Amino acid sequence: MSHEHKKLKAVDMTSGSIVRHLIMFTIPLLFGNLFQQLYNTVDSLVVGNFVGSEALAAVGSTTSIVNMLVLFFNGVSIGAGVVISRYFGSHNDEKLHLAVETTIAVTFICGVILTGIGIYIAPFMLELMDTPDDVLPLSSEYLQIYFGGISGLLVYNMGSGILRSVGDTRRPLLFLGFSSIMNIILDLWFVISFHMGVAGVAWATIISQFASAALVLLVLTKSTENYRLVWKDLRIEKKILKQILMIGLPSGLQQSITAFSNAYVQSYINYFGSSCMAGWSCYTKIDQFVMLPMQSIGQAATTFVGQNLGARDVKRARKGTNVALGLSTIISLTMAAILWILAPQFIQLFSRDPKVLEYGVLFLRLCLFFMVF
């Protein structure tokens, strides 16, 4: 193993305790996902406490649309991570380099396309979801600004996925922590000092996302390893892209279909007015945090399986999958019990409006029954 691999503490999961590898690799991923989730959640916290329930409903009404697209590309990034971790595990440096270049090139192209399309269709998507007239202008404003900077989110997710695939979970976590703190500061600054409302939290989010993306690209560019990003070599290798899509597309479609169903539910929630929308928004934010441990275990298992398949140890890869499923089940049941008891206190973090609290607690407790699935 090279000097830089030792310095970055790259994790070779092809030997040693499976449980220990998964837990130790999951912890930094969990914190990273926590910081990632803070972006939109902080937006809701700030507008809910400093602007009003209509602004909270506006931000919340966009979540399912954003997630539908972002989760699709997150699924594709899982495919890229599996391919890269396989080449890393098999020490195929040439293929590793090509996989990195292909991943980044595709990300840039998708970011540009998604930005253009998203800004244009954002108002129409919200109208299709029957967003109330008193919320629609704020929702459209937030969503269009968000789409304007979505490339930063995609680049960070793909770039940090590359680093995690070769065992570097520390720096993506540090970068995301830095940008999350930046987002909180900018949220409060734009909303309280400049009274920018919903637009302020949207701008704070995309500025912070571009900061984290720039840091990840800098690390990949400055690396001396074969996963280094060489701009002049940036291209799409068709065979590698096919491998990425064969794994990533099913994962992306699965995740985006779930988000699509949430968007469908959101359209019915919108019929009941801004208080119900705000209560649903509070529930979804909490639900997204609750799912983070299981999501992080899944990401750790992806890298574990990828490296062991690259090392041609299928039996160990299967054992790792079973261990990950067991850990996820235990954690989900524990968190469901805690949230059932403390549901009102968690909803009150976002809003103290009695109607919002009533709806939020109802949604949270109903959905806890299905968390383990």
Predicted regions span which residues?
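Helix-terminus/linker motif at the lipid-water interface of multi-pass membrane proteins
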Residues: 34, 38-56, 126-133, 189-196, ...
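Small-residue-rich hydrophobic transmembrane alpha-helices
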Residues: 56-116, 153-172, 279-343
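Alpha-helical transmembrane segments of multi-pass membrane proteins
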Residues: 133-156, 288, 294, 354-373
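Small-residue hotspots at the loop-to-helix junctions and early N-terminal turns
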Residues: 51-64, 139, 143, 202, ...
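Short membrane-interface helical motifs at transmembrane helix boundaries
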Residues: 113-144, 334-357, 361
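Membrane-interface helix-loop junctions in multi-pass transport and translocation proteins
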Residues: 180-214, 343-345, 358
